Amino acid sequence: MNRHLLASWLIGAALLGAAGCKPAAVPEEFPQAAADGWLAAFNSGDAEGLALMYSQQSEVLPPDEPIVSGAARIEQFWRDYQPGQVRLEISDVEVSKLGDYWYREGNYTALVQDEGMPRIGKFIELWVLEGSAWQLYRHMWSPNSPPPAEMPPVAPAG
């Protein structure tokens, strides 16, 4: 068999095989609109709107406090927290798809009314699709505490 005929057969077989392949899936994007909705509800002080952003099995893990779970408790947590008194800005955000969840982490700056210095920290979120809405499944944040300027002396053992 001559080379040209063999090459034609190989190209034809490759094209025929490729014709039966499924097109490449379009990569799913992070549900940014949901995250933007949470931030808008927080900055406007809408505790009820914040509570609606969490899934049925959601847990909020605030710093220095017990885990908060259940829709009523999450809403009460945000009412007590008084969002809207704090202007939250986020930065350095990274997202990644983990199975059925979207993972998002980044830094935040909290601008508190009547305080001169912003509070800076980091956050982690897991988002899950419930019905047709992306909702928070886990939500955790913590402030970046500055290290002490000087360590106290250690008392001698004895």
Give residue ranges: language-model regions.
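A short gly/proline-enriched turn/hairpin at secondary-structure junctions
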Residues: 53, 58-68, 80-84
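Surface-exposed, charged secondary-structure patches
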Residues: 75-117
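Bacterial N-terminal signal peptides
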Residues: 8-18
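A mature extracytoplasmic/lumenal domain signature
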Residues: 54, 64, 94, 107-108, ...
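Short, low-complexity N-terminal intrinsically disordered segments enriched in polar/charged residues
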Residues: 19-56, 72, 148-158
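Positively charged n-region of N-terminal signal peptides that target proteins for export
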Residues: 1-5
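Short beta-strand edge/turn micro-motifs at domain boundaries
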Residues: 22-24, 120-147
